[in-house]
């Protein structure tokens, strides 16, 4: 059987990414698995020398084909920092943002070429990314640009709750101006395709409303009747099992209890808050709509505890395992 390899990007080297990657890859279930890290080898060795990460072999390779997977070995494709000695833990720095960008770019090239079958990303810092001249709101938009993907969406994934977002990194004031029937219908379709890919035969998809009580028949806003309902009607006409618009304050609990397989959230915090409350340590961020699987730990760079040894690797480990499963 063909070995499916996952590339793991370091994220911002001044954050917890390097630490949680090495910790995760030293665990049972990932130790010796077909995984290749793309990041700054000098940074990884520095953390190891400080006793922050386990004492495993960090083996440099230039190509994925060179890897010989075995317990106790982590294979690294080196993307060096311009000035590794100048890197400061927990600080926003242009060279760190540039490294995070280059790691994602290299991983994308490997995935599109077929050298790896999925990507798992450690968190990057958006301010550092912008400081380096890479003006993307986050991983999702960066990957969409690198792969020329037009229809994509952010999924937050746990065993008991799965959420897909119509919008993500946009100011709430601007969100309503960009909301459209076309976008909502597109995201419903992405959700249906994604769920079928991961094993759901007839996915049940709930669409959350925008307004309190899903508008209460227009009393608290007309977006539900004017924008969401036509999208739901069109999706049903295409054979999708779609429900809503559902009151946002109850639909996530209903999905968590098994009534729906995925919730379509309208904006970033509407979807992120319930999922992080119910699955902070085992939640995985997935970009649906790319030509390959991309997963990510569902948290940020945690600059406040970077390079202290305090970072927990559970979410990173879960995201890598899910990438291996879905690849």
From Swiss-Prot:
Catalytic activity field: 4-O-phospho-D-threonate + NAD(+) = dihydroxyacetone phosphate + CO2 + NADH
Residues that coordinate or bind substrate: 139-140, 276, 285, 294
Keyword NAD: yes
Transmembrane stretches, start-end: none
Top-rank EC class of the record's enzyme: oxidoreductase
Listed Pfam families: PdxA (PF04166)
Keyword hit for Metal-binding: yes
Residues binding a divalent metal cation, per UniProt: 169, 213, 268
One annotated GO molecular function: metal ion binding
Enzyme Commission code(s) on record: 1.1.1.408
Cofactor(s) needed by this chain: a divalent metal cation
Cofactor note: Binds 1 divalent metal cation per subunit.
Record's keyword terms, sorted: Carbohydrate metabolism, Metal-binding, NAD, Oxidoreductase
The protein's role, per its UniProt record: Catalyzes the NAD-dependent oxidation and subsequent decarboxylation of D-threonate 4-phosphate to produce dihydroxyacetone phosphate (DHAP).
Similarity section: Belongs to the PdxA family. PdxA2 subfamily.
Subunit structure of this chain's protein: Homodimer.
NCBIfam families according to UniProt: pdxA, PRK03371.1
Name the UniProt record assigns to this protein: Putative D-threonate 4-phosphate dehydrogenase
Organism whose genome encodes this protein: Salmonella typhi
Gene: pdxA2
């Amino acid at each position: 059987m063909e070995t499916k390899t996952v590339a793991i990007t370091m994220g911002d080297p001044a954050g917890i990414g390097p630490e949680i990657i090495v910790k995760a890859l030293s665990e049972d279930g990932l130790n010796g698995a077909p995984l290749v890290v793309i990041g700054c080898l000098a940074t990884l060795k520095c953390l190891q020398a400080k006793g922050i990460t386990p004492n495993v072999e960090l083996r440099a390779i230039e190509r994925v084909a060179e890897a010989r997977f075995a317990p106790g070995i982590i294979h690294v494709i080196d993307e060096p920092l311009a000035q590794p000695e100048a890197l400061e833990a927990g600080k926003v720095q242009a060279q760190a943002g540039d490294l995070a960008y280059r790691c994602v770019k290299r991983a994308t090239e490997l995935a599109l070429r077929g050298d790896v079958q999925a990507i798992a990303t450690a968190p990057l810092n958006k301010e550092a990314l912008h400081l380096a001249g890479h003006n993307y709101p986050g991983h999702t938009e960066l990957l969409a640009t690198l792969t020329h993907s037009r229809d994509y969406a952010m999924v937050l994934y746990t065993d008991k709750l799965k959420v897909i977002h119509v919008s993500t990194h946009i100011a709430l004031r601007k969100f309503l101006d960009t909301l459209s029937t076309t976008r909502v219908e597109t995201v419903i379709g992405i959700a249906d395709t994604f769920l079928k890919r991961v094993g759901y035969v007839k996915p049940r998809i709930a669409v959350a409303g925008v307004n309190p009580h899903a508008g209460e028949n227009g009393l608290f806003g007309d977006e539900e009747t004017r924008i969401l309902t036509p999208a739901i009607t069109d999706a049903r006409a295409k054979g999708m099992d779609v429900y809503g618009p559902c009151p946002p304050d109850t639909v996530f609990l209903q999905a968590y209890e098994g009534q729906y397989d995925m919730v379509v959230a309208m904006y970033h915090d509407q979807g992120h808050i319930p999922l992080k409350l119910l699955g902070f340590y085992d939640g995985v961020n997935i970009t649906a709509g790319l030509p390959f699987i991309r997963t990510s730990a569902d948290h940020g760079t945690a600059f406040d505890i970077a390079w202290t040894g305090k970072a927990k690797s559970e979410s990173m480990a879960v995201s890598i395992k899910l990438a291996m499963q879905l690849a």
